[in-house]
């Protein structure tokens, strides 16, 4: 009740309580005994008993109370019929159920009851009086100690004025009967004593009594255990502490609890006093001859007084029984137990020797006594004073108690406290031993063979004597010598041996405690070292290779980080709320970095985290292998992993992502392999726990299924089970709009994280700056993209702004606001294929080279053609169109004009605006009316005209107006001009994450046996996806005879001619570390795109002729199909050359042609553009 707030206590006091008469009312004999004894009551009673103060004038009510009549305790309040009868003592039932007597006039009692005080006697029903002043006093003084008597509060609240008439009462006052007993109506008691009677309680007396009660309550509370951290740990709860307080109250008067505040401060005082005594007394006895000084006597007298008081308090202090952790509070048991344990030692150490000497000196004042004391009693007094050193036992007991207090209250390591105590005890023993080394020779009057006489230190100062004595004692105790010299006398020899024994014992104890302390400070690291020693012995026993041993060592370092502990057993011993709190704290970074958890229900996150298991993987470890049965899914806390498929498609996942959930959802086999690229710290979730959690949260199951479908779509795979589930959920309307938005947000976050992981893992090549959107776009569908970008960098009339990175936060920002990563992935051109067994690519050390000189590109079956290139390909039955000679050099560039020119000229990107403005400068003549639209930018990249001294007729460019709509296609039936110069053509290629199979067929010769022009041999490729086909960059046909030469093109003054080989040299700078191609064949090129894992491009491979007319091994009309390799190491890349340089199309060389090869009667498939509109 002491710790309850005032409002709560007021509510408790105001509650009506129906308490039985036997519980709270004394019988008549007890009442008589109480009044006869002056109001004393049993201290073991817990109810608040209040007695009235004696009235100044004799009152019949007091006599009636002494007689013990029942009417004087509980009769209803009544008065005489005429209103002026004398008042008698009336009993009133207070709101807390206690019976308190009130004295006063009828008017005052009636006013407290809320009614009048006169009239006839009437029986009162059982009601309750409501007096705010009385309630406030009851609350203030309700917590009385068991043995105190107090005046009932509220009596002197309203003193009556003498002679004041009683106000008339409308009805008789209804006073509740005594403590719940219903009195009959005729049990009226005559009330005597009017208003003039001076029987009111004075406020001063009440204040004095209240102050005395307050001090007694405060001092009583000091003897009880307080509600603090130490007591709560000892007893378990605040309720148990309150029960212990009640035990102290009921145990008797002046019983001190061992965990009370008073005992705490008393023990602290005695601890300091004992330390002072144990240090000062040996020095005073040994080195000071005059012991009659005032400071010395005062110190001894005060010390003896405190120790005597402590001896008395030990008889009233509870004793803690260490066997059953019970506390003895019975005074008789405390006395018997203390007499049997430490009483004798404490009494001997507390004998007041100085008190005895002072009493004797005051009574016997003679010179004979003083001389006798100085000569004979001095040795006895010194030896008797040594008994005070037995107080060391109290010091040890108090220190042991304080060790427990520090260990339980402040969580200090008990080993540290023990080390400090051990050091203090060693220093104290050294101090005593030093004093003893000087005291023994002094008691012998310094013989000649003692160390003091040999060193001539008899008459030196006490400081010098103490220093040499302490040095001699510590030399003995540490066993390092005998001091300045070896002992000579017999007493010195025995003292030296005693010092050695004590010192060796203390030294051994110190070493043992120090070792335990060091081991306990870092036990987890010691366990790790012991465990790793076992691992090393295991590796040595099995003779594991050094690289495996190093991997095992690295694994242990990253997994345990030098500390080993059983985390599962630790968490299993904790309560469930504490376990969840610790797991949430350990996985806070995982939750913060994972969009799946950030948008999920907190209960789902907690349920998922409590079932996770921590694992560590090294770089190169396959966490999941394709085709195996999945039993776990993984959440990435730190690290980067690669998701690999059989098509060699790779996806990066980084911190905050997860994988392996597809087989857990479909109960099938793994659809991809996952390899760790760095050290990965993962959390795994078993399939049973996964399904258990998702059964409770169906919305999160739909999110997992949707993300799994999106990931399968990104790697080119499908799953009918997941697709059916998702479509069923969407059609049935299970989820609402908010849940669908959360699922879409989770899918979008997963795509962005995969894109960021690819960017983080990509290495930036050392190359000249090129147009960033062309490189960082997730789509590089043509080999000429690299050539166009390089041409952009060398064009002198383009502004420098286009060579800077786009201003958006991400690379995808330059691709258009409406294009999401999903749309871009669906627009990518992919063509995975397997290399031929006969191809040189089967050997990793050999380059992949084509075996034909004149190659022809054809699409594979089932693959659609980009829309931008659809107009370049004639149908199966149409003859090829003739190509003018003037446009032959720009044939390769014309393909890109058709595919990209329109979108470049019509793009709204801010980066392309200066390009369009620069395309139409005032120095250029306007294009003819028949020129196709969209050539403002690309016309600057045409080679210089025939007037250049380093250019040939095959390298001439022409204005936009002279470019035919067919982009190098002439009238049908025109024969093709054969090549005349046997010069090798340069070779340009573009690369991305994958390579597409390209079918090349030479023109102009008969096919060899086993081959036909209509059905060229192709290698197998992956089936097309629903989201898009794998297309190839096709070159326009050039098999028809050349048309008559057109008129020469006018010279363009605004565009300076490019230097010979300039673009080729610049391309060589980009990949200078790549070796040259072999002379007998061309090598395919594949370079991994740093920003896209799914986009693929095709290299346009020009022929490498060996003879002027025909390449060796290839006849007219022979078709040769080549497959670009999947991977090409950095050492197998050819030196890149430009298609548009001076050596791009030499006169007389074989012309690179391309035409779609279809079977007879095959219908042309509709083509769709796979290029983004703003590229």
Swiss-Prot record:
Pfam families: cNMP_binding, Ion_trans, Ion_trans_N. Residues 450-478 dip into the membrane without crossing it. Residues 289-292, 353-374, 445-449, 479-488 are extracellular. PROSITE patterns: CNMP_BINDING_1, CNMP_BINDING_3. It is found in: Cell membrane. Changing residue 553 to A: Reduces response to cAMP. Activated by cAMP and to a lesser extent by cGMP and cCMP. cAMP binding causes a conformation change that leads to the assembly of an active tetramer and channel opening by shifting the voltage-dependency towards more positive voltages. Binding of cAMP removes a tonic inhibition conferred by cyclic nucleotide-binding domain (CNBD) on channel opening. Cyclic dinucleotides can modulate HCN4 channel; cyclic dinucleotides acting as potent antagonists of cAMP. Inhibited by extracellular Cs(+) ions. Auxiliary subunits can also regulate HCN4 channel. The chain crosses the membrane at residues 260-288, 293-316, 330-352, 375-410, 414-444, 489-521. The modification Phosphoserine is found at residues 145, 1089, 1093. It is a multi-pass membrane protein. It catalyses: K(+)(in) = K(+)(out); Na(+)(in) = Na(+)(out). CDD domains: CAP_ED. One of its GO terms (molecular function) is AMP binding. Residues 162-175, 1038-1050, 1102-1114 have a biased composition (Pro residues). Residues 1-259, 317-329, 411-413, 522-1175 are cytoplasmic. Homotetramer. The channel is composed of a homo- or heterotetrameric complex of pore-forming subunits. Interacts with PEX5L with a 4:4 HCN4:PEX5L stoichiometry; reduces the effects of cAMP on the voltage-dependence and rate of activation. Interacts with IRAG1; regulates HCN4 channel activity. Interacts with IRAG2; regulates HCN4 channel activity. Contains six transmembrane segments (S1-S6) and an intervening P-loop. The segment S4 is the voltage-sensor and is characterized by a series of positively charged amino acids at every third position, while the S5-S6 segments together with the P-loop form a centrally located pore of the channel. Contains a cyclic nucleotide-binding domain (CNBD) in their C-terminal region. The CNBD is connected to the pore forming transmembrane segment via the C-linker. Hyperpolarization-activated ion channel that are permeable to Na(+) and K(+) ions with very slow activation and inactivation. Exhibits higher selectivity for K(+) over Na(+) ions. Contributes to the native pacemaker currents in heart (If) that regulate the rhythm of heart beat. Contributes to the native pacemaker currents in neurons (Ih). May mediate responses to sour stimuli. Belongs to the potassium channel HCN family. This is Potassium/sodium hyperpolarization-activated cyclic nucleotide-gated channel 4. The gene is HCN4.
